[in-house]
Amino acid sequence: MAREYKIEDYRNFGIMAHIDAGKTTTTERILYYTGKSHKIGEVHDGAATMDWMEQEQERGITITSAATTTFWKGRDGKSRRFNIIDTPGHVDFTIEVERSLRVLDGAIALLDANAGVEPQTETVWRQAEKYNVPRMIFCNKMDKTGADFYRSVEMIKTRLGATAVVMQLPIGAESDFKGVVDLIEMNALIWRDESLGAQWDVVEIPDDLKEKAEEYREKLIETVVEIDEAAMEAYLEGQYPDNEQIRALVRRGTIDVKFHPMFCGTAFKNKGVQPLLDAVVDYLPSPVDIPAIKGIDVKTEAEIERHASDEEPLSMLAFKIMNDPFVGSLTFARIYSGKLEKGTSVMNTVKEKRERVGRMLQMHSNSREDIEEAFAGDIVALAGLKETTTGDTLCDPLKQVILERMEFPEPVIQIAIEPKTKGDQEKMGLALNRLAAEDPSFRVKTDEESGQTIIAGMGELHLDILVDRMRREFKVEATVGAPQVAYRETITRQHEEDYTHKKQSGGTGQFARVKIVFEPNPEGEEFKFESKIVGGAVPKEYIPGVQKGIESVLSSGPLAGFPMLGVKATLIDGAFHDVDSSVLAFEIASRACFREAAKKAGAQLLEPIMKVEVVTPEDYVGDVIGDLNSRRGQIQGQEARGVAVVINAHVPLANMFKYVDNLRSMSQGRAQYTMLFDHYAPVPSNVAQEIQAKYSGQK
């Protein structure tokens, strides 16, 4: 079977946004207008096609990034293939956003015209910057009370530090929003309400907007000619680019992430979606427009590139594992190069295991179609893979490569979980392992002392949903303990420790002496090990044992047994015995050496500090600030946003549990908040003593 669509006609993109900016509704409209969804699903009544997990339908928030393939005829009448990845907008799921951005070529950033740039918008925007993803902006909900397109444009500059190139102006706002002015064609599009947005009339620009349209077209041209010398010179000599030249320049600037074309509309009221789809074709990149993906050649360890071509060796990245009720475990993968046929054997170069592709599926949010082969640029779901987890590379066994890995944040919150009955016990273990394979930001461990199962994640909602999924999908009933904070420990001063390990009673003896300087690592939170041994005081082959010994005890600090951050260890001297010394002896010595030193090097407890943003009506500002202060919060600033006030604060996670209930009652349900992990900071001594007493079992 040959390739149906040329790779130049692919658009792999996602929709990223704050929690309520209307992402699922916008995706639904795209599926409706591209003919993939016959009934428009509304999030309000839990029927959206992309939101296919039961809980998403109940909570009205998107949790799993479902991948959907659909098609759209552009302005030129030629059909293009869209692979759309739906991403969640809730802070507890930023890991989902990050991993979908990793495999996208472009994105549409959605703003709520009333709220503008919100905290989560900033978070996903920063993640997109990290992966250099070209973005367009859609200012949604123009029909909402308080909708202000021009304020949103300003906020993109002030809050995101980005350049928005305005491509359309709104005609009317709030309940009077009728259509848009197209600043390239310089005409107006007015939607017909009765046709569910499928039809619109092209009319002249209304008189009261003509001057503004001229002003914004001038700004548009000024911005785009800056990226091309010839166009700039012509412009300065009074020659304006024609419409197709403007489009070509906007495309180039968008793909090079110099600026972001901005559109407006209301997905809910079916206005503005089709011009947005045309813009996806016109301005977002195809797989060949972006730089080739880099990787490491497994044989030579040299950096190599894989270009978006069917002729290159097969390489793909697994970016999501999902449990499908009909097919079992599905691995979503983006094919960067080469071709993949059903039944082929591929190499997982991260796990060093071969995998066989049993079935290959093309997904449409929750319906699926079996396919025989797939090509560069495709996003496919593979059934039958046993070893692969998120972030692994799959490739041609004869041309092995490891593509750039994804980084996943450490969980900040943990809870103990117990099965309700004996029958649930075994099922719970299986369920937790399956969920952990799907979600790399979710960890499962057993507490060595209490024997309890501990689950850790990115926030309360994250863990709630996983426990809920366990009940629904795996029929496991479990009781959940109170959430606990993931504290850390560190050292605050330099200390030199000399330790000798000797065991000479019967059989082979053990001997190792180490002298190590421990100090805070100035370069960050990682552990750093150095050896400054000269003259063979410790033979070279024993030095890895010293490092391994220290690393093995970093997981349990001296104060309350929490993992340690930011330690630097330098081995400066030691001694060995010709017969009794071994790697193991040095491992034991360095382990004991660090345990001794950690107590004397100013051990300190650290706690996760969250960046909290509260949006509240003015009447409740005093109460909100007072409450945040009582939670050991530090107010970073406040600003007016429309009729509301935005309060930014840094607050210890330990004091934020059940905050949502407090905020609701304090503001009669009118205030909202978002919370993100920001950094680790020392715990005040009075609080630290309580924590130590609690975790050292003295209470």
Swiss-Prot record:
Chief localization: cytoplasm
Cleavable signal peptide: none
Domain tr-type G: 8-288
GO CC terms in record: cytoplasm
A Pfam family reported for this protein in Swiss-Prot or TrEMBL: EFG_C
GO biological process terms, semicolon-separated: ribosome disassembly
Alphabetic keyword roster: Cytoplasm, Elongation factor, GTP-binding, Nucleotide-binding, Protein biosynthesis
One MF annotation (Gene Ontology) recorded for this entry: GTPase activity
Subcellular location: Cytoplasm
InterPro entries to which the protein is assigned, alphabetical: EF-G-like_DII (IPR053905), EFG_II (IPR041095), EFG_III (IPR009022), EFG_III/V (IPR035647), EFG_IV (IPR047872), EFG_V (IPR035649), EFG_V-like (IPR000640), G_TR_CS (IPR031157)
Record: residues binding GTP: 17-24, 86-90, 140-143
UniProt keyword annotation of GTP-binding present: yes
Segments passing through the bilayer: none
Superkingdom assignment: Bacteria
Known role: Catalyzes the GTP-dependent ribosomal translocation step during translation elongation. During this step, the ribosome changes from the pre-translocational (PRE) to the post-translocational (POST) state as the newly formed A-site-bound peptidyl-tRNA and P-site-bound deacylated tRNA move to the P and E sites, respectively. Catalyzes the coordinated movement of the two tRNA molecules, the mRNA and conformational changes in the ribosome.
NCBIfam families named in the record: EF-G, PRK12740.1-5, small_GTP
Similarity comment: Belongs to the TRAFAC class translation factor GTPase superfamily. Classic translation factor GTPase family. EF-G/EF-2 subfamily.
Name of the featured protein: Elongation factor G
Gene that encodes the chain: fusA
